Amino acid sequence: MTTDQITLRSPAPDEMRAFFGPIADAFSEDMSEPEFDTERRLLEPERCVSAFDGDRRVGSSAAYSFRLTVPGGEVGAAGITGVGVLPDHRRRGILRQMMAWLHDDAIRRGEAVAVLGASEGAIYQRFGYGQGTTTSTFSLDPAHARFRDPVPPDPSRRIRMVDEDEAARIFPMVYDAVRGDIPGAVGRSEDKWRLYMLGDAD
């Protein structure tokens, strides 16, 4: 796809390191090798798009494939992620072109929904996005953490530590058992569980 000398295309598998360049620059962040390896394992190159001004990569974005719970079932969804345009190429319609590319790709795949997590949500209202939820992160000091209500002892119920392999087997089953009852819950791939939920980014 070419518009006003800006060309869009998916990166080849051996271009994935370069693909992340505009995203890292747009957020003023360096991507470590472990972070790159994590993202490389999660993203599908054919769902990634870069914008080029001549031979220079000036923007990048991507979409994850996942299943989204909706009332009555689940649908395929595109998880838009990593939207970045270099500062010297902003206000030239590159974001709009990449979003159109990702949306068209989602339509071709039969995906009914596109979602994204945004650092600046107002940017994406022009593309039809609205706030669906918020996120919060909490840290608990184990020395002072308590159940809200006392839990009566029950010898038939036990708590035990599990290693990563067992967690990777059990946690997805528990999650998937309840996910179907929670509209807006997202399916997670095995790699997503291992790399993000269980912390194996090596």
PLM-predicted stretches and their roles:
Residues 1-7:
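Short, low-complexity, intrinsically disordered N-terminal peptides in bacterial proteins
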Residues 107-108, 201:
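Residue-level signal for alpha-helix termini/capping positions
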Residues 8-83, 175-202:
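A conserved beta-strand-loop-helix scaffold within acyl/acetyltransferase catalytic domains
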Residues 135-202:
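Amide-forming acyltransferase catalytic core, primarily the GNAT-like/NAT-type
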Residues 14, 118-119, 166, 188:
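Short beta->alpha linker loops
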Residues 108-112, 117-137:
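Conserved active-site alpha-helix within GNAT-family acetyltransferase domains
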Residues 82-107:
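Conserved acetyl-CoA-binding loop-helix of GNAT-fold acetyltransferases
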